[in-house]
């Protein structure tokens, strides 16, 4: 499952028409506009005249602009947005248009909204209050989004809210809570925060793992693909609890939008008790943060430089959380931006 946004609308879906797709594009497509139009035509061929297919621009996390396509059916006036930018990159790398469109059909069929989830249910607060969750985003980079969405400030970040439509081990489908929806519900931001905190902790259980434990999971997930020498090399790496630079990964069991574990009840306090003092918080991405015990040899400036270098070279633009580093002061139960 991709990380899908949902939109309103109405259309019909003839889900058993996949065999009717005919992709017929000679030559090379050079622009996203032409590519998106070709995909749109293919989806209309698959789902028939009663289907409504739309292509639109979407502003994602950190102000990233993407091109999305929605396929709407009459059974639900909502539809997932499937982003085309990655597919266009694949096309330019040689992937065929037919192969791409077949995958888009598969993605839609897996993620389409079921009959029991509709816009009417979203606007009824009682129907969605147990699905309201939160996540952390960069406040400055999401200024445009925050103009039209309730949020709570946290350091240089913002806590925003969403309705969880579905989730599995490959992703989530969600609806961002906008100001108009909040006003329709007749609730305040504090109420949203309290509900979201309870729901997020319940639906996305948090965990803090040492690097040794993370490496063990990686080995376990890919053991068949690694030979004995590679496995030994992993465990010879000097990055664990007994190293001079121990690091711990804090996220949730789904490893999705896990940076908000910082807001979970007791997480920071319990970790401080475990290590016996203060620790740095490194915003690895929107999906996880790193905890690094503070000691006299630790240089905050080095950590900040490291975070900024990793963000610039290793983290996807829409997954960057912050270029800053924070410290948790155990004696004051207080987080400070360095």
Question: Which residues make up each language-model segment?
Answer:
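Glycine- and charge-rich intrinsically disordered segments
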Residues: 1-18, 223-236
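N-terminal alpha-helical "arm" segments
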Residues: 2-9, 17-60
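Short amphipathic alpha-helical segments
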Residues: 27, 31-39, 92, 96, ...
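Basic, alpha-helical nucleic-acid-binding regions used in initiation and control of genome expression
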Residues: 31-32, 44, 99, 103, ...
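Charged, alpha-helical interface segments at or near domain boundaries
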Residues: 57-248
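Short glycine-/aliphatic-rich beta-strand segments at the starts of folded cytosolic domains
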Residues: 245-257
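C-terminal structured domains
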Residues: 253, 261-338
């Amino acid at each position: 499952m991709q990380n899908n946004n949902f939109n309103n609308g109405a259309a019909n879906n003839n889900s058993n028409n996949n065999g009717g797709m005919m992709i017929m594009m000679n030559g090379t497509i050079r622009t996203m506009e032409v590519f998106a139009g070709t995909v749109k035509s293919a989806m209309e061929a698959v789902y028939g005249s009663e289907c409504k297919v739309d292509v639109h621009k979407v502003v994602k996390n950190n102000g990233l602009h993407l091109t999305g396509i929605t396929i709407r059916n009459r059974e639900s006036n909502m539809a997932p947005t499937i982003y085309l930018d990655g597919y266009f990159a694949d096309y330019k790398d040689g992937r065929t248009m037919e192969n791409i469109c077949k995958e888009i059909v598969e993605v839609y069929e897996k993620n389409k909204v079921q009959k029991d989830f509709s816009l009417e249910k979203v606007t009824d607060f009682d129907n969605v209050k147990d699905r309201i969750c939160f996540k952390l985003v960069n406040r400055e980079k999401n200024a445009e989004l925050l103009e039209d969405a309730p949020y709570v400030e946290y350091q240089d970040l913002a806590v925003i809210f969403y309705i969880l439509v579905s989730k599995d081990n490959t992703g989530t489908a969600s609806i961002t809570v906008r100001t108009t929806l909040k006003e329709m519900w007749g609730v305040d931001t504090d109420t949203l925060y309290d509900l979201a905190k309870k729901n997020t902790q319940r639906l996305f259980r948090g965990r803090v793992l040492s690097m040794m434990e993370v490496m063990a999971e990686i080995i376990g997930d890919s053991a068949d693909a690694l030979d004995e020498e590679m496995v030994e090399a992993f465990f010879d790496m000097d990055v664990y609890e007994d190293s001079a630079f121990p690091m711990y990964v804090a996220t949730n069991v789904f490893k999705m939008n896990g940076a908000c574990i910082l807001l979970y009840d007791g997480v920071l306090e319990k970790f401080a008790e475990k290590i016996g003092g203060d620790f740095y918080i490194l915003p690895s991405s929107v999906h996880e943060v790193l905890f690094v015990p503070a000691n006299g040899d630790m240089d905050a400036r080095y950590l900040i430089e490291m975070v900024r270098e990793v963000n610039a070279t290793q983290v996807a633009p829409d997954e960057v959380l912050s270029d800053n580093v924070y410290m948790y002061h155990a004696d004051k139960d207080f987080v400070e931006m360095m």
